[in-house]
Amino acid sequence: KEIAAKAAGEETCQGWMEAAPSVGFTVWDHSDRRTIYLLNTDWASDQDQRPATFIYKGKKFPVVVRRYHIETIHCADGLAVMPASNTTDILSVCKRENGWVIKVQTTGNDVVQCMNAVTGKVEPIKFDEPGVHEVFVNE
């Protein structure tokens, strides 16, 4: 148990999940970011969603994991981005002097949650039409 806790502790600086009942996750490391895939495994109850806690660089963020969805969290350079839609793609997250430029491709309306590991704040960004969008998120 101690070995597992130590290994998990080392991962939180790149983005990790606290253990939660009925929420499974896996991690994929790309050359420029980490993507966490979350799955609500509670198919027996009448609960449509389960709470979980995302940890990034010492900050903790509550997230909701919906039934029948694979949720994703993309982590890069101190910013984590979680789209609401399964068809939204986070194309890039690039650190700049006072924040990040994120490039997002949507197939319709969507909201992405930007979780700032520097300040601990969460900022939702709303997209009102499909396409490729580039937005700046302040540090």
Regions found by a protein language model. Give the residues of each.
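Non-catalytic C-terminal accessory domains or segments of carbohydrate-active enzymes
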Residues: 1-139
